[in-house]
């Protein structure tokens, strides 16, 4: 499994992700609920640290952060095109 898909799954899946934003050496992800986030599963190879605060999960991936964030956003956007319109209001927007 690609790192971006592992991170999406660990963040509670597509429906739990509100926003993905690359921030220098980390990926800032706003989630609907922290209860759906599996922090242990976020600690895959390539992840240096995980910081959780409020509805935000910051995933530190160093120099690879921008590329991983771009792959996560592309994956989320591709799902949006295959998701029924009524589900989009419940779905995350990246």
Residue ranges and their predicted role:
Residues 1-94:
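Soluble N-terminal domains of membrane-associated systems
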């Amino acid at each position: 499994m690609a790192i971006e898909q592992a991170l999406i799954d660990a963040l509670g899946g597509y429906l739990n992700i509100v926003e993905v934003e690359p921030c220098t050496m980390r990926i800032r992800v706003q989630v609907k609920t922290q209860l759906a986030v599996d922090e242990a599963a976020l600690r895959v190879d390539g992840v240096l640290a995980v910081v959780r605060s409020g509805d935000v999960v910051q995933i530190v991936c160093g120099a690879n952060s921008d590329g991983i964030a771009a792959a996560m956003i592309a994956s989320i956007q591709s799902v949006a095109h295959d998701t029924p319109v009524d589900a989009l209001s419940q779905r995350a927007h990246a």
